[in-house]
């Protein structure tokens, strides 16, 4: 379907029997209308040609070979319209064979059949509209019971036999025995109603606007009553109100889309185009057929049997007719959704048949696999792992993936540099993984961005561009700051990588899709490249330090895991001495030499504003030295004074983790200021 803006769209919904026949019917030059599939056959076993009026009939679905009819006559296919488009002998149209991908047929059902999606799927649309229990409707559809038609002021057979109580099954074994096929059909059409035809009659009698009005009034009355105090009654009222809301919404949808409720009961069953349910010949002359063909054959067999019972046989009991109608209903249910009513239908090898629902639903269905998630060239997929050393706009590609994605560019580079005479020699060098191959691949990747995509792509940041670099292993390395935009984490998530080929695509990737160009959320404008999950845990571990504090370290020296090499002696009554460093380089050097740990407390000489320490806080300890200088030890800093009480230097109590974080932030700020001063 194409809307007024020329956008291709797909709409799934109910259609009228007239629309189904319009999809399939074709008028031949002799006035014959073709489109109905009446035979359950596919190909003739001798000629291997499609059977006439069968599931692969060329008159209904078009020729197998373009411009060649079933007789073997050939005619050139032209664009201009001509009067004679059909073969006079076989009635096959001279068109392109691709018509068999979209030309449909139909099966004219001998009795109405409910669409199992609208009956059995929850919520049941038919049960909602009719306001009846689903179990009751199922019994009516599958001919387990019936109900009497209201016939006023007329003598009826049911009145002669007494009161006919609703849902009593005695009629099933007594009434049909008194009638032949035609008489029972007349009796049933006049006095009782059963099967899908009864559902269709009730749906056709519905007035959707009256349903909306009555449901709205009932909902208001239930709301005005208020809670009763009985929990069970209140829940019952709540469920009823929810049901009324769903019923009103469903009725409004039918009115808005111009769909009639009785269309949920089928009189014509559409037949899919042959190319969507093919029969393929494999090695050894064996044939492989789609399961849908077998399910269609089952429907046609049972439908033809019912037609014979209704037209040719005049002495068939009415009970047998109803049993055959039930079989037709079950065959259509299996075709549409195998197993929805319990045990699924299986073939001779105990394999479950794939119904129409199985073909289109799920991850491997028609929509998600071939329409929404098509496999494309120049793409790959792998697990993502964290790359903490990467820049924000870079990603790490495994060598195995990179050499496949950029293979044509590497081949071109080898030929241009006269390292390979042709494509075959270049491919052999790539297979042998010669060192020159990796050098050329590195040059190619420097000027070629890639696109990373994580499904489901729910917003614009679900696919971003990166500058690839080669990494070891088989996983894609990703900067942790871009995880929030992808809604990704490193617990086994997979991402797809695509190579933009055209200049327009590469320009779009560089100017609009690079990760460092998408730092804000397109929805609310908040920063989206923020630390999450692993980064937050790492920052916490980096800056957590020693929770015991300076007092606990001095007066509770039980835990000496990190400070065994700094004890003054082996006496457990003495505290761990915290080292002093004149600058951050010495502290980091001691950490690299494993003389201290990441969370080891230490004293670092610092240029601290003296006004910040002129408080009334009393020192925890004061250490005096022989030359008159002394150390005032506070909880977070240490002051060294001379004999005149002048401040010589100040130390702050910190850890190597705090120092590393501060240096990274300081370098980032300096780089930003330098970039601003240079006008970048």
UniProtKB/Swiss-Prot annotation:
It is found in: Plastid, Chloroplast. It holds the Pfam family RNA_pol_Rpb1_1. SUPFAM superfamilies: beta and beta-prime subunits of DNA dependent RNA-polymerase (SSF64484). Mg(2+) binds at residues 489, 491, 493. GO terms for biological process: DNA-templated transcription. GO terms for cellular component: chloroplast; DNA-directed RNA polymerase complex; mitochondrion. One of its GO terms (molecular function) is zinc ion binding. It catalyses: RNA(n) + a ribonucleoside 5'-triphosphate = RNA(n+1) + diphosphate. Signal peptide: none annotated. Binds 1 Mg(2+) ion per subunit. Binds 1 Zn(2+) ion per subunit. It is an enzyme of class 2 (transferase). Zn(2+) binds at residues 69, 71, 87, 90. Its cofactor is Mg(2+); Zn(2+). Keywords: Chloroplast, DNA-directed RNA polymerase, Magnesium, Metal-binding, Nucleotidyltransferase, Plastid, Transcription, Transferase, Zinc. Its EC number is 2.7.7.6. Belongs to the RNA polymerase beta' chain family. RpoC1 subfamily. DNA-dependent RNA polymerase catalyzes the transcription of DNA into RNA using the four ribonucleoside triphosphates as substrates. In plastids the minimal PEP RNA polymerase catalytic core is composed of four subunits: alpha, beta, beta', and beta''. When a (nuclear-encoded) sigma factor is associated with the core the holoenzyme is formed, which can initiate transcription. This is DNA-directed RNA polymerase subunit beta'.
């Amino acid at each position: 379907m194409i809307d007024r803006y020329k956008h291709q769209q797909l709409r799934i919904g109910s259609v009228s029997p007239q629309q189904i026949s319009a999809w399939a019917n074709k008028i031949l030059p002799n006035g014959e209308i073709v489109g109905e599939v009446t035979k359950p056959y596919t190909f003739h076993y001798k000629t291997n040609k499609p059977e006439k009026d069968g599931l692969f009939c060329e008159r209904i679905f078009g020729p197998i070979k373009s411009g060649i009819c079933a007789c073997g006559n050939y005619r050139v296919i032209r664009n201009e319209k001509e009067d004679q488009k059909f073969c006079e002998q076989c009635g096959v149209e001279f068109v392109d064979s691709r018509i068999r991908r979209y030309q449909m047929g139909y099966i004219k059902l001998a009795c109405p059949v409910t669409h199992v999606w609208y009956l059995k799927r929850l919520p049941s649309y038919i049960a909602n509209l009719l306001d009846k229990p689903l179990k009751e409707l199922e019994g009516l559809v599958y001919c387990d019971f019936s109900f009497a038609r209201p016939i006023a002021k007329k003598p009826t057979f049911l009145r002669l036999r007494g009161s006919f109580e609703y849902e009593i099954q005695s009629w099933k074994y007594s009434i049909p025995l008194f009638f032949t096929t035609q008489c029972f059909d007349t009796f049933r059409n006049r006095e009782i109603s059963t099967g899908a035809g009864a559902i269709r009659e009730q749906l056709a009698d519905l007035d959707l606007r009256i349903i909306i009005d009555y449901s709205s009034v009932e909902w208001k009355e239930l709301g005005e009553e208020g809670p009763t105090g009985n929990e069970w009654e209140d829940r019952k009222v709540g469920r009823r109100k929810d049901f009324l809301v769903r019923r009103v919404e469903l009725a409004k949808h039918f009115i808005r889309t111009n769909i009639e409720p009785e269309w949920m009961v089928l009189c014509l069953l559409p037949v899919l185009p042959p190319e969507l349910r093919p029969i393929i010949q494999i090695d050894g002359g064996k044939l492989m057929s789609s399961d849908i063909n077998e399910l269609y054959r089952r429907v046609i067999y049972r439908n033809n049997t019912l037609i014979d019972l209704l037209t040719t046989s005049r002495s068939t009991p009415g009970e047998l007719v109803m049993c055959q109608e039930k079989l037709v209903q079950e065959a259509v249910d299996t075709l549409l959704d195998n197993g929805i009513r319990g045990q699924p239908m299986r073939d001779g090898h105990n394999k479950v048949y794939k119904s129409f629902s199985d073909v289109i639903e799920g991850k491997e269905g028609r929509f998600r696999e071939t329409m929404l998630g098509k496999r494309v060239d120049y793409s790959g997929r792998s697990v993502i792992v964290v790359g903490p050393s990467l820049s924000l706009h870079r990603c790490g590609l495994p060598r195995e993936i990179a050499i496949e994605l950029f293979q044509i560019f590497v081949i071109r580079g080898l030929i241009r540099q006269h390292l390979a005479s042709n494509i075959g020699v270049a491919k052999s060098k790539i297979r042998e993984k010669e060192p020159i191959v990796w050098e050329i691949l590195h040059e190619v990747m420097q000027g070629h961005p890639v696109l990373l995509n994580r499904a489901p792509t729910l917003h614009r940041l679900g696919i971003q561009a990166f500058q690839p670099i080669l990494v070891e292993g088989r996983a894609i390395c990703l900067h942790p700051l871009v995880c929030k935009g992808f809604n990704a984490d490193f617990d086994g998530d997979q991402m797809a990588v695509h190579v933009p080929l055209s200049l327009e695509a590469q320009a779009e990737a560089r100017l609009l899709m690079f990760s460092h160009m998408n730092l804000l959320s397109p929805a609310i404008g908040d920063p989206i490249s923020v630390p999450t999950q692993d980064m937050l845990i790492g920052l916490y571990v980096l800056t957590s330090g020693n929770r015991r504090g300076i007092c606990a370290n001095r007066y509770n020296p039980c835990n000496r895991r990190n400070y065994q090499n700094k004890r003054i002696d082996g006496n457990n009554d003495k505290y761990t001495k915290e080292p002093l460093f004149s600058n951050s380089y010495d502290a980091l050097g001691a950490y690299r030499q494993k003389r201290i740990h990441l969370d080891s407390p230490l004293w670092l000489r610092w240029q601290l504003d003296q006004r910040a320490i002129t408080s009334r806080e009393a020192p925890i300890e004061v250490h005096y030295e022989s030359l008159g200088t002394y150390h005032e030890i506070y909880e977070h800093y240490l002051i060294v004074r001379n004999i005149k009480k002048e401040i010589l230097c100040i130390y702050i109590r910190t850890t190597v983790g705090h120092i590393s974080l501060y240096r990274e932030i300081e370098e980032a700020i300096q780089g930003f200021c330098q970039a601003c001063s240079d006008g970048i």
